[in-house]
Amino acid sequence: MSILVIGANGGIGSKLVDQLKEDNVDFTAGVRKDEQVSELENNDIKALNIDVENDSIEDLTNKFQSFDKVIFSVGSGGSTGADKTFYVDLDGAVKTIKASEKAGIKHYVMVSTYDSRREAFDASGDLKPYTIAKHYADDYLRHSDLNYTIVHPGGLKDDAGTGKIKADLYFDSYSTIPREDVARVLKYVVTSDKFSNQEFQILSGESTIEDALKAYE
């Protein structure tokens, strides 16, 4: 089992890389800049240049050939302009989905926004383009030929993780979760053969990750 983490230099992705390395999982960190590749390799981490905005589907397909699983943890966030959001969070995601299909990826894990339903389009200000992009990227993944899991984390914090969460298809309220715990969830999902064609929201809670996700196995 070989895993590609796209967005390995991000807030969640970098924590996931640390956790996968600690557990001696076979993975490669996908990052956008050559200097990031060099820095990771200097720390004994396999790395690959993955630029979801500028790489073609053919480029990505060729890069994905040696992997079994892909995690998409790339995000422009709400602070960039709408154009960058659609280039990265929508078109970039769709290109990786198409490339994963062509490369025969066995499991594609998407890190989405907390709520990407159409009802969430009323998000104010800069978050609206981001929510729209995530909505259509998630929907494209659901209708692809891939075995997928979509993870919808709540508000992201830099606090130390607790390893305790709660999960549901849709919660009635909004709360937060440390990035470290989101990474733990991703590690648990991607190193398992379960969670086929499932999606769920995750927040800080009182249950272990294993117990919280039992309903989605």
Task: Show which residues each predicted segment covers.
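Substrate-positioning beta->alpha
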Residues: A93, D172-K187, Q198
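Short-chain dehydrogenase/reductase
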Residues: E199-S207
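Non-catalytic, hydrophobic alpha-helical segments
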Residues: I12, V70, V151, V182-L186, ...
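N-terminal Rossmann NAD(P)H-binding glycine-rich loop of SDR-like oxidoreductase domains
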Residues: I3-V25
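Glycine/proline-rich active-site loop of Rossmann-fold NAD(P)-dependent oxidoreductases
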Residues: A120, A160-I165, V189-Q198
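NAD(P)H-binding glycine-rich loop region in Rossmannoid oxidoreductase-like domains
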Residues: V31-K95, A99-K102, V190-K194
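Conserved Rossmann-fold NAD(P)-dependent oxidoreductase catalytic core, especially the SDR/UDP-sugar
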Residues: D26-T28, D34, T80, K84-F86, ...
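Flexible, glycine-rich beta-alpha linker
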Residues: T149-Y170
